[in-house]
Amino acid sequence: MMCNLLLSFSVLLLSCTHLVAHPVTDTADMTYSGPDSVEEAGGVSPDDFAVSDLNDLLQRAAVVEYSPLLSRENIKVPGQIPKEALRELLLEKPYRLIPPSGLWGSRRQFRKRGGGADCFWKYCV
């Protein structure tokens, strides 16, 4: 009896942890009581942010393949928050985060041949 209770409690606990890990889908109901300005938040200016720290951050962002942006010297971050620069990098080249289509087994698109009398459907001889 005690074993069944312990087993059911552990299964319940394990299933709840997966539900808690999901992000909130509707953020309109949530209130944000953060600072009103960057000065209150203690934001980091681009001059205070070390170039080596930014390089480490960009290397972590380029997960799939090497980005030529990582080797640039004197990287300047526009604005007050380095997250904006990272977001611009990710939105600029989104194909770097997607693995090549050959790994997914996708086929090439069908291309019609001109003047093919020996064709049946899409198979031409």
Curated annotation (Swiss-Prot):
Residues 1-21 form the signal peptide. The keyword Isomerase does not apply. One of its GO terms (biological process) is blood vessel diameter maintenance. Residues 109-111 form a propeptide. Keywords: Cleavage on pair of basic residues, Disulfide bond, Hormone, Secreted, Signal. GO terms for cellular component: extracellular region. GO terms for molecular function: hormone activity. Pfam families: Urotensin_II. Disulfide bonds join 119-124. It comes from the Eukaryota. Its main location: secreted. The keyword Secreted applies. It is found in: Secreted. Belongs to the urotensin-2 family. Urotensin is found in the teleost caudal neurosecretory system. It has a suggested role in osmoregulation and as a corticotropin-releasing factor. The non-hormonal portion of this precursor may be a urotensin binding protein, urophysin. This is Prepro-urotensin II-alpha. It comes from Cyprinus carpio (Common carp).
